[in-house]
Amino acid sequence: IIEPDKDSYRQSTMTKRSVKSIYLSKDEVIRFLQKDTSQYRILPLGSLANENRWSAFQIESIMGYHPAKIYRYNKLKDEVGWNSLGVLQMLNVKYIITTEELPHPAFDLVFTGKLFHQSKYQSTNVYQFKYAIPRAYFTQEVVVIPEMEIQFAMLSKQDFNPLASAIIEKEVGEVEYNPNAQVHISHWSPDKIEIEVSTPTDQFLVLSEIYYPEGWEITSHPDWKIHPVNTILRGLHIPAGAH
């Protein structure tokens, strides 16, 4: 019902043009976040959790609402949640957005300003995650665990460190971590990602993008396989050399 009868006690699904104009206009929090041109994601908490407005400004969020849910991601959210700092790291979370205070040693308050939410401006805090990691990184070791439930148990541990180990479902071959390896994302878009890597040894690269088996291929190396990592991310076995 788009425009219900006045006596029906239902609200109209239509939005006033003035509200839409403000919705699509930058507020103080949006402007602050856009100053950071690195690749990162945010975690909105509380009443902001289902907010989708961020996408209008190309700000990536690990929350939001969509009726069609990716099974692996939704399962992780329900089974593990966001209480593990390691999970926030692997999801490339850099900022926590909340209308409340967040007294936690892992997060620093870096900005307070107005955010347009639920048709009004609200004072909102932006906390920076001290231990945020890049969108793409080499992990020190790989651990083979086929069972999803056991993977969830490992991800739930407070000492889980995505830089130290990556959980995979099948063997990928020998890897030898070398801290001198380099990885750089030269292009990113929803349907194409270009990555430049240089490594003196065979290593395992984790890309903080959601794993989905269909529709993706490594165009420069069609024989390389994309592996599910930590249940929901993508991983590649990278041979020594520059690629």
Which residue stretches match the model-derived regions?
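Periplasmic/luminal catalytic loop of GT-C fold multi-pass membrane glycosyltransferases
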Residues: 80-117, 130
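Generic recognition of flexible, low-complexity loop/linker segments
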Residues: 28-33, 82-88, 113-116, 181-184, ...
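Structural motif
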Residues: 45-48, 98-101, 210
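Active-site regions of enzymes building and remodeling cell-envelope glycoconjugates
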Residues: 55-62, 105-124
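Active-site-proximal, structured, solvent-exposed surfaces of multi-pass membrane proteins
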Residues: 63, 161-243
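Short, surface-exposed loop/turn motifs at beta-strand boundaries within globular domains
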Residues: 37, 52, 89-91, 120, ...
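Extracytoplasmic/lumenal acceptor-recognition loop(s) of multi-pass membrane glycoenzymes
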Residues: 2-93, 126-174, 213, 223-224
